[in-house]
């Protein structure tokens, strides 16, 4: 039994890490890192805005783990494309609003850096929402128009 577990371990590791090399995996990892950097900048200046970064970092990390371990295919009662789309769309809108508020206040260099990084996060989350839009991915083939009956 130990031999079969040992033999399946590299395959399991390969399956788990193969998602991190995809476009979506790199995008989610970049979102996690950017949220962490924004959290550090907000914590250095004002902690009032840091909750957005914490929540979005947790959501992105949870989805990253679910996609990486292929848990999204095992949990079928959640519509994962729509969940990911709404997560990234709401994050883009909230980061845009928060960044504008922080840049208008503009007191302190860490707030300005956090505001600019928040605008960058808006673009990143907006791009994520664009590429994960579920209706864009569904392609329908045209129905045949030739008559099936003879001449």
UniProtKB/Swiss-Prot annotation:
Tell me which UniProt keywords the record has, alphabetically: Membrane, Transmembrane, Transmembrane helix
Q: Where is the MARVEL domain?
A: 19-137
Q: Does the keyword Transmembrane helix apply?
A: yes
InterPro entries on file: Marvel (IPR008253), MARVEL-CKLF_proteins (IPR050578)
Please report a single Pfam family linked to this protein: MARVEL
Single GO term (MF):
chemokine binding
- Transmembrane segments annotated in the record for this chain: 25-45, 48-68, 85-105, 112-132
Its membrane topology, per UniProt? Multi-pass membrane protein
Domain of life, per lineage: Eukaryota
Q: Provide the primary localization.
A: membrane
Q: Is Protein transport among this UniProt entry's keywords?
A: no
Q: According to its UniProt record, where is this protein located?
A: Membrane
What does the entry list under GO cellular component?
Answer: membrane; plasma membrane
Q: What is this protein for, i.e. what is its function?
A: May play a role in cell differentiation in the intestinal epithelium.
Q: What is this protein called?
A: Proteolipid protein 2
**What's the source species for this entry?**
Rattus norvegicus
């Amino acid at each position: 039994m130990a031999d079969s577990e040992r033999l399946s371990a590299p395959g399991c590791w390969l399956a788990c890490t193969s998602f991190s090399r995809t476009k979506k995996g790199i995008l989610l990892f970049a979102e996690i890192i950017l949220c962490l950097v924004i959290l550090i900048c907000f914590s250095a200046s004002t902690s009032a805005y840091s909750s957005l970064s914490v929540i979005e970092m947790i959501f992105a990390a949870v989805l990253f783990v679910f996609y990486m371990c292929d848990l999204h295919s095992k949990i079928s009662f959640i519509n994962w494309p729509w969940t990911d789309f709404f997560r990234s769309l709401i994050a883009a809108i909230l980061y845009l609003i928060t960044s504008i508020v922080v840049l208008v206040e503009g007191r302190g260099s860490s707030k300005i850096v956090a505001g600019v990084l928040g605008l960058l996060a808006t673009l990143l989350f907006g791009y994520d929402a664009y590429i994960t839009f579920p209706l864009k991915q569904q392609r329908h083939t045209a129905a045949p128009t030739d008559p099936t009956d003879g001449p």
